[in-house]
UniProtKB/Swiss-Prot annotation:
Organism: Homo sapiens
Name of the featured protein: Cell division cycle 5-like protein
Disease: A chromosomal aberration involving CDC5L is found in multicystic renal dysplasia. Translocation t(6;19)(p21;q13.1) with USF2.
Keywords: Activator, Cell cycle, Chromosomal rearrangement, Coiled coil, Cytoplasm, DNA damage, DNA repair, DNA-binding, Isopeptide bond, mRNA processing, mRNA splicing, Nucleus, Phosphoprotein, Repeat, RNA-binding, Spliceosome, Transcription, Transcription regulation, Ubl conjugation
Chain spans, region Disordered: 108-143, 247-278, 408-443
Highest taxon listed in the record's lineage: Eukaryota
Region spans: Required for interaction with CTNNBL1: 200-206
Chain segments carrying region Interaction with DAPK3: 501-659
Motif Nuclear localization signal mapped to chain: 165-271
GO BP terms: DNA damage checkpoint signaling; DNA repair; mRNA splicing, via spliceosome; positive regulation of transcription by RNA polymerase II; regulation of transcription by RNA polymerase II
DNA-binding region, residue range(s): 31-54, 82-104
Coiled-coil annotated residue ranges, if any: 142-245, 676-701, 764-802
Length: 802
């Protein structure tokens, strides 16, 4: 008895690969030919396997909640129409049907109270899968059957054969056509070489013959054109960029190596700057603790004195209330004014709000569909099948309505009545008490109705606001009218200046000046004092000019000399002595610090303070007032004018002043080793070299500083003017192009003008030549006509003779 092969069953990995390769070769229409490669599958099964599992457009991810809700609603609207439902959801029909049955089975388990985590659609041992085309492929066994190996080798051979009978026939026809064309071409060439032209017979084509005509051809207008751009320029091939590493791009290993190198450098810099964080990072701690910043709290709103006053008032009200209770006064006025404020009002239970109970809409819809599926015939009558309340809100995703938070309504002296603290109140809603919530602050005990409940108030309506103001004003007026008449009249009379003093005292008592303002005012006072003190100092100190580090007292002349000093010499000695005293005072109180040692320690200055103090004790320094200094300055100015007139000194020009200054400055030399100035003619060669080296170093420092400053300014100007520069370059290029066009147009204009002149001069000559040629041709034609007539006559004569 022959072996009967029943096609079908579980798909294997080898069969899936053969099916995909066959679809790539034969397409999605020749399923019989594709099935001939698979001995155990039919054409229908191959087609189902492709469209239900192997197609790359099939979605195989987990079902989302929105897709499940959409599936249940569409199944309710279009039952059993899975081919229509599938493209709406984005799944296959088999997937939709399978998941729908899965949801129904899950709902049935829920009704039967069988809470199991297993899939209800899972096959039990011994069951056969009715739809193997929608399941993943089974791995291939290590030892295949002979039939499977034969099928695999046959499929490999057939799929690898791309030259079938039809392909060979097409190739042969193509070769014959090419040989026929070459033979005809060779024949035409040989005939053309023999002097015989054969016109090629072309079949008349409908439409445009693209081999003979140029479609959409636009012939250029007659004239002269620039053909410089049409010249072919050979490309300068850069063979360095055609290397393999340039074509392949940067390798991943090279990029990772560069990144690792950057990380090492970054870690090295981090170790130098921030060692603790680098240690934490290298030890494997990814999230190390940050440095805690200093806690900055706002200033207290209530001072200690005010707090003590509140405590005293509370104690006084408590004593008054106890006195009223002991005396037996229990009227409404006393109970209202003297209310209890010690015990916290716990009218609202301290309960944590529980999570609102939510319902599983997918489970409800599945239960409804299962109940509608199992409903009895309506001929029996009775009640309808009980269903859960549902709607079509699950077709689209649900969005939560967000209310705008209102910080104005969350003030500490207002308790909202609708339980929505900090949200915009909705008009027209019923106020609800705050239930099942833990209060966020101490509830207000407002026995005097100072803060009335206004949760229902609509403050956006101006008419309502005006009405509330009018009612409160009327209520206040009625309350004031109800007050008892005063028993005693008092009149307080203030003195005339008491109001101003009272206002000033109130301002001084209430206003507390800020610490920053106090510091700023003190700093301004100190700056003013410093400026005033600086004005009383010497001009050299005020302008921070270089001053000598040592005082040369040998410039003074001895008093007991022969011959004795004159009055002018004595005056000069007094001036020198005062100058030496001023130098000692400045070196003691205002030592000079060179610009290079501003931040560091001053070297060689201020070390002889004891010497200066001793000298100033014997020769005290006298300070003068501002008026005395002004008088002395006026006297000096007058003396300078007298000397200028007496010496006939005119106005000195800047060139002459600079020349004199350069000559004087060239005679002075600074010795860096001794930190002093001396005359150039008294210095040695070594001192001159050291001085010049110091000057060169200073000049280089100035050059470096100015270069850095210039670089910063250049960078800043480049940022500011970069756009303008690029715009200017673009405009300059456009301007140059326009000038070139103008010159070219001018050159063409001159060329055409010259051409017109030549043509105007040549046209008459051409006309004369043409007229002569025509006249000559006419005469020749007449001669030929006469000759033709003679020949005809001679012909007739000969005919008549013979």
């Amino acid at each position: 008895m022959p072996r009967i092969m029943i096609k079908g069953g579980v798909w294997r990995n080898t069969e899936d690969e053969i099916l995909k390769a066959a679809v790539m070769k034969y397409g999605k229409n020749q399923w019989s030919r594709i099935a001939s490669l698979l001995h155990r599958k039919s054409a229908k099964q191959c087609k189902a396997r492709w469209y239900e599992w192997l197609d790359p457009s099939i979605k195989k991810t987990e079902w989302s909640r929105e897709e499940e809700e959409k599936l249940l609603h569409l199944a309710k609207l279009m039952p059993t129409q899975w081919r229509t439902i599938a493209p709406i959801i984005g799944r296959t029909a088999a997937q939709c049907l399978e998941h729908y049955e899965f949801l129904l089975d899950k709902a049935a388990q829920r009704d039967n109270e069988e809470e199991t985590t297993d899939d209800p659609r899972k096959l039990k041992p011994g069951e056969i899968d009715p739809n193997p085309e929608t399941k993943p492929a089974r791995p291939d066994p290590i030892d295949m059957d002979e039939d499977e190996l034969e099928m695999l080798s046959e499929a490999r051979a057939r799929l690898a054969n791309t030259q079938g009978k039809k392909a060979k026939r097409k190739a042969r026809e193509k070769q014959l056509e090419e040989a026929r064309r070459l033979a005809a071409l060779q024949k035409r060439r040989e005939l053309r070489a023999a002097g015989i032209e054969i016109q090629k017979k072309r079949k008349r084509k409908r439409g445009v013959d693209y081999n003979a005509e140029i479609p959409f051809e636009k012939k250029p207008a007659l004239g002269f054109y620039d053909t410089s751009e049409e010249n072919y320029q050979a490309l300068d091939a850069d063979f360095r960029k055609l290397r393999q590493q340039d074509l392949d791009g940067e390798l991943r290993s090279e990029k990772e190596g560069r990144d690792r190198k950057k990380d090492k450098q970054h870690l090295k810099r981090k170790k130098e700057s921030d060692l603790p964080s680098a240690i934490l990072q290298t030890s494997g701690v990814s999230e190390f603790t940050k440095k805690r910043s200093k806690l900055v709290l706002p200033a207290p709103q209530i001072s200690d004195a005010e707090l003590q006053e509140v405590v005293k008032v509370g104690q006084a009200s408590e004593i008054a209330r106890q006195t009223a209770e002991e005396s037996g006064i229990t009227n409404s006025a006393s109970s209202t004014l003297l209310s209890e404020y010690n015990v916290t009002n716990n009218s609202v239970a301290l309960r944590t709000p529980r999570t609102p109970a939510s319902q599983d809409r997918i489970l409800q819809e599945a239960q409804n569909l299962m109940a509608l599926t199992n409903v009895d015939t309506p001929l029996k009558g009775g009640l309808n099948t009980p269903l859960h309340e549902s709607d079509f809100s699950g077709v689209t995703p649900q969005r939560q309505v967000v209310q705008t938070p209102n910080t104005v309504l969350s003030t500490p002296f207002r308790t909202p009545s609708n339980g929505a603290e900090g949200l915009t109140p909705r008009s027209g809603t019923t106020p609800k008490p705050v239930i099942n919530s833990t209060p966020g602050r101490t509830p207000l005990r407002d026995k005097l109705n100072i803060n009335p409940e206004d949760g229902m108030a609509d403050y956006s309506d101006p008419s309502y606001v005006k009405q509330m103001e009018r009612e409160s004003r009327e209520h206040l007026r009625l309350g004031l009218l109800g007050l008892p008449a005063p028993k005693n009249d008092f009149e307080i009379v203030l003195p005339e200046n008491a109001e101003k003093e009272l206002e000033e005292r109130e301002i001084d008592d209430t206003y507390i000046e800020d610490a920053a303002d106090v510091d700023a005012r003190k700093q301004a006072i100190r700056d003013a004092e410093r400026v005033k003190e600086m004005k009383r100092m010497h001009k050299a100190v005020q302008k921070d000019l270089p001053r000598p580090s040592e005082v040369n007292e040998t410039i003074l002349r001895p008093l007991n000399v022969e011959p004795p000093l004159t009055d002018l010499q004595k005056s000069e000695e007094l001036i020198k002595k005062e100058m030496i005293t001023m130098l000692h005072y400045d070196l003691l109180h205002h030592p000079y610090e060179p610009s290079g040692n501003k931040k560091g320690k001053t070297v060689g200055f201020g070390t002889n303070n004891s010497e200066h103090i001793t000298y100033l004790e014997h020769n005290p320094y006298e300070k003068f007032s501002k008026e005395e200094l002004k008088k002395a300055q006026d006297v000096l100015v007058q003396e300078m004018e007298v000397v200028k007139q007496g010496m006939s000194h005119g106005e000195l020009s800047s060139e002459a002043y600079n020349q004199v200054w350069e000559e004087c400055y060239s005679q002075v030399l600074y010795l860096p080793g001794q930190s002093r100035y001396t005359r150039a003619n008294l210095a040695s060669k070594k001192d001159r070299i050291e001085s010049l080296e110091k000057r060169l170093e200073i000049n280089r420092g100035h050059m470096t500083t100015e270069a850095k400053r210039a670089a910063k300014m250049e960078k800043k100007m480049k940022i500011l003017l970069g756009g303008y520069q690029s715009r200017a370059m673009g405009l300059m290029k456009q301007l140059n192009d326009l000038w070139d066009q103008i010159e070219q147009a001018h050159l063409e204009l001159r060329t055409f003008e010259e051409l017109k002149k030549h043509e105007d001069s040549a046209i008459p000559r051409r006309l004369e030549c043409l007229k002569e040629d025509v006249q000559r041709q006419q005469e020749r034609e007449k001669e030929l006509q006469h000759r033709y007539a003679d020949l005809l006559l001679e012909k007739e004569t000969l005919k008549s003779k013979f």
